[in-house]
Amino acid sequence: QEERFSRKKHDPSYPKNAIEFVLKYANLKLSEVDQIVFFEKPFLKFERLLETYVAFAPRGFLSFSKAMPIWIKEKLFQKNLLFNKLKQQDSNYKSDQNIFFSDHHLSHASSAFYPSPFEEAVILTADGVGEWATTTVAIGKGSDLEVKKEIHFPHSLGLLYSAFTYFTGFKVNSGEYKLMGLAPYGSPIYEDKIKKIIDIKEDGTFRLDQNYFNYATG
């Protein structure tokens, strides 16, 4: 939520201001925090990227050559980067042993369930893609949260929506809300064509016809 403080949309920088706000609200020092949890598992995401590029090779080589240096620099050493930033923020923060990495969809589900007033709930998460999962169903009971069902990449409602965002001329991972705002003013004239793209099963799962997409190769 750093953008709420920096006023920079999609601010990718280390969330120093957001962390300071939370610590002040809880009347804590950073060195007093028991656990710090990052929202995804970089190594599993890296595994997906490698497996996908290998599966579709030689297509996507240009995307691969651009993505790998960034991942190696910024993602594979994420724990060390986080520790250094946290240490700069609080000189009393001495160890990285309380830094953990959560499954991306479990992070989504946790942020919805634990602040809620419910003791028990079913949590549906659908986004572009986490490590491998694109859609998950989880059960929350008390302090426990368990993922029960998953749909994996490349079959993704989020990526389908981003494909439409791109097709209509908006920026992916930024302009989706504009498309959502425009949607009520449209008519379902392409419904039959869209039904050819996505196959929805009786149990609610789905598959996308990959002949219409190239996001697996960048």
Q: What are these regions, as identified by a protein language model?
A:
Residues Q1-G218:
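Short acidic/glycine-rich loops and adjacent helix/strand connectors
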